[in-house]
Amino acid sequence: SQGLVLPIGTFQFPWFSHVNVKEGHDLTEELGVQKWELPLSPQLAGKAKGNFPSFLKKTDQERIQNCYKEMKRDHADKLFEGSIKLDGSSMTVYLKDDVFGVCSRNLDLQETEDNTFWKVARKNKFEEMLRAYGKNVAIQGELMGPGIQGNRENLPDHEFFLFDVWDIDGQNYYTSLESGDFVADCRDSGYKLETVPYVSMIRIMEFSLEDILKKSDVKSLNHPVAEGIVYRSMEDSSVSFKAINNKFLLQEK
């Protein structure tokens, strides 16, 4: 999601002026900007059972360039935990009122033999794991491997890397400590549950915007250039942002 800087005079719209358009104004709809994403393979796209469930929350973070002032104003002294932003495909697995489901970023998917999301869920016994845990929860993470975003990490098989646990009944994310306990419980029960790599902790009051962006220049799982770092508040995981590695953006041009 890169942009192009142009002088205001370039835009031939009557409403586009210094008076009507201020810093931070979202011009997506006015300019007709649309996001283009690589088309998914049939094994990833799957067959839809329905739209992404309303009782879940989609995974998304604001870029730090768009929210640094607000973060420093409202959360300056809070401790944020940083994890590697993996370049894969968003995957959500849930158990609600005895119903088990698997979702891509936008869809609740039917189980079919060739769907990669469901195959990974079955391989890792996620249904048994969530039933053993005994609560209405969803796990959200990155699906990585062959055929996904060019498989930058050069993984031989498809793997799931957890980054969030969503409490369906409470409609909130687990805190970092609660997520850690969840992962430990699942592993102690014999289930395989990989997490995204954790890298550092910061307090926003101690870093400038430029410093936070520089910290995103790190290695990924296997690739020398990570996509970036996602930071989540240790107190409230719904407070989060991402810092994208400029080296990654240059490679993606």
Show the residue positions of the predicted features.
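Core nucleotide-handling region used for phosphoryl-transfer chemistry
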Residues: 1-253
